[in-house]
């Protein structure tokens, strides 16, 4: 493993990162919080997190690690491309990832002690704004690399459009909490599409080594 190339590691990160993140995310959303709990209802979410404290902590750790792995892959994609737009975008991806990891840490803290329930508002806000910044960065990276001959431009434009949708849902959910549950559902669908594209791009990156 010590001699693995930058492209191979970056490709693996693009494949494994989003898949693992998706698995832990859905375990937390479906297995810990539940589909009937509105994320805007802080008391209900806190009750669900503390009732499943071990799983809350494990999924928060899993999501955090997977997001960092994914970030490495995206940064490698931007560095390999070398264009100005994706270079800017990876800064946004970095900040968005940091926000998500902080939010995951606060979520784990809530799960560990019901007295930390007051942190939920902060965790939710950081998560929401982290998603906005990350989506903007991902959009810039996708647009930046779309002109490269090893990237399918038409598919890249579709993914860029999905990133715009993700960005809009983040903004709408941030301004109007009553829409948060619906916006997060749409955002989850966007992330699934991101994951499929990331796997494709990751496989191609490994092949370019």
Regions found by a protein language model. Name each.
Residues 2-209:
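Hydrophobic, aromatic-enriched alpha-helical segments typical of multi-pass transmembrane helices
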């Amino acid at each position: 493993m010590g001699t693995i190339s930058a492209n191979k590691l970056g490709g693996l990160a693009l494949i494994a990162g989003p898949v693992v993140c998706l698995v832990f995310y859905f375990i937390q959303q479906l297995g810990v919080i539940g589909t009937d709990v509105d994320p805007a209802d802080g008391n209900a979410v806190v009750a669900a997190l503390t009732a499943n404290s071990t799983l809350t902590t494990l999924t928060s750790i899993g999501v955090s690690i997977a997001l960092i792995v994914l970030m490495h892959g995206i940064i490698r994609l931007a560095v390999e491309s070398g264009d100005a737009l994706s270079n800017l975008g990876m800064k946004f991806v970095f900040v968005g990832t940091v926000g998500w990891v902080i939010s995951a840490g606060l979520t784990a803290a809530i799960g560990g002690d019901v007295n930390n329930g007051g942190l939920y508002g902060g965790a939710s806000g950081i998560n929401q704004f982290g998603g906005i910044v990350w989506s903007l960065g991902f959009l810039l990276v996708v647009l930046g690399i779309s002109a490269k001959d090893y990237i399918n431009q038409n598919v890249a434009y579709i993914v860029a459009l999905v990133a715009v949708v993700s960005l809009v849902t983040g903004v709408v959910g941030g301004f109007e909490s009553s829409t948060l549950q619906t916006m997060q559902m749409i955002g989850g669908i966007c992330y699934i599409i991101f994951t499929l594209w990331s796997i494709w791009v990751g496989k191609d990156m490994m092949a370019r080594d």
